[in-house]
Amino acid sequence: MTENIHKHRILILDFGSQYTQLVARRVRELGVYCELWAWDVTEAQIRDFNPSGIILSGGPESTTEENSPRAPQYVFEAGVPVFGVCYGMQTMAMQLGGHVEASNEREFGYAQVEVVNDSALVRGIEDALTADGKPLLDVWMSHGDKVTAIPSDFITVASTESCPFAIMANEEKRFYGVQFHPEVTHTRQGMRMLERFVRDICQCEALWTPAKIIDDAVARIREQVGDDKVILGLSGGVDSSVTAMLLHRAIGKNLTCVFVDNGLLRLNEAEQVLDMFGDHFGLNIVHVPAEDRFLSALAGENDPEAKRKIIGRVFVEVFDEEALKLEDVKWLAQGTIYPDVIESAASATGKAHVIKSHHNVGGLPKEMKMGLVEPLKELFKDEVRKIGLELGLPYDMLYRHPFPGPGLGVRVLGEVKKEYCDLLRRVDAIFIEELRKADLYDKVSQAFTVFLPVRSVGVMGDGRKYDWVVSLRAVETIDFMTAHWAHLPYDFLGRVSNRIINEVNGISRVVYDISGKPPATIEWE
């Protein structure tokens, strides 16, 4: 009997902040399970979830607007601790008898708050002290409205010159509100405050650890599928790889992985996937060489969106054909992760998150009546990687840079040809190899190369030649929503360019992309 790792749980109500998923990841990092729900949940749903504590997230709207989101009143009647963050604090204050007004000045960025009264939330936590010994906290503010009067049964815990109620508390009911974002790294003691709330005030044990998550997932897979056979599309990416390892541990040879080699992968990637999962880990893998089929379907197509659709359609066709060859397969496994579930669909309000399955593989034939197995659907990407390490997958594979689903199909601009893919594979391998040698690979968030379908004149020996142009791309980002181009050293870029032009016959010019996002996107197509 495995331990109930969901026993202690935090409910996070989402009011639309860009940081809400980060709040959930921070709670998980503390070893405590949590779920992220829309703000307009019912009392019955909260009761069924039975949280140990509730966090009200930030949000972009104004509590002073008539139809702005409100926490369900039951949140304050459930008898569990409640932690309001930014907008969450404002709606808590307003709903419990306080007052909120639009501020004359929007506070955005770094601020220092002074702790003026004792509270369980921040006791013993400080970044500095005032001249008269009061604790100071370095925090990250992002708000337009502010609380101008707290509910009568609350106390002021901390303030700034422009924000009189930076932290408020009702210690008896264990209600806390902060007018800053403890989940971001700019709030230096933010993680300690979240830990104080989750572990001490809500009294949650750290049961949510990689080893225990694996034990729980294996037990749940076995309970769900029993002795049935399962099929999985294995791409070699993080999600499908960790899904494969979990299923293999749970059901062994009853798992069949279908690896479709579409000819759009990185250099030697197909061989590496087959060697690692087949030879090393002993998984049952069906290898489908399908390069010609994909490239012939892509012939003559220049439009990026059309290329994506073609690659997706052909993959589904190939996967379906292989699935039909297998006998008695009852289940389809997919590497759906928690952000997929959260973002999957919106309710009529446009705010609520509706949980539904992501069909990563696409539509299976109607005659195949299969159940769905999604062992990662409660996990964030960083948790999936940690579980992968625990399962024995190599660090370099789990933490390598993102690679698009359509692969080189969207890194070869315009029409995709085998010649172009072969050149780009070699170019990309040189760039990545040099980044690793220079200890730069882990310092950038994503690096890759792009094939440009233009010829440029070059000089080789005594002759001139017209060959292809490639672009190097490297970016630094926290969330991939915005990104800066990476300021790689000139001597490094020169070394990479020299190697590519000298070692890859067919390339005459190397350029470096210095576009940020926005206005550019990270990928070119």
Swiss-Prot record:
Pfam families: GATase, GMP_synt_C, NAD_synthase. Its EC number is 6.3.5.2. InterPro entries: Class_I_gatase-like, GATASE, GMP_synth_C, GMP_synth_GATase, GMP_synthase, GMPS_ATP_PPase_dom, NAD/GMP_synthase, Rossmann-like_a/b/a_fold. GO terms for molecular function: ATP binding; GMP synthase activity. Keywords: ATP-binding, Glutamine amidotransferase, GMP biosynthesis, Ligase, Nucleotide-binding, Purine biosynthesis. Pathway: Purine metabolism; GMP biosynthesis; GMP from XMP (L-Gln route): step 1/1. One of its GO terms (cellular component) is cytosol. Residues 208-400 form the GMPS ATP-PPase domain. ATP binds at residues 235-241. The active site is at 86 (nucleophile), 181, 183. Signal peptide: none annotated. Transmembrane segments: none annotated. It catalyses: XMP + L-glutamine + ATP + H2O = GMP + L-glutamate + AMP + diphosphate + 2 H(+). Residues 9-207 form the Glutamine amidotransferase type-1 domain. Catalyzes the synthesis of GMP from XMP. Homodimer. This is GMP synthase [glutamine-hydrolyzing]. It comes from Shigella dysenteriae serotype 1 (strain Sd197). The lineage of its organism: Bacteria, Pseudomonadati, Pseudomonadota, Gammaproteobacteria, Enterobacterales.
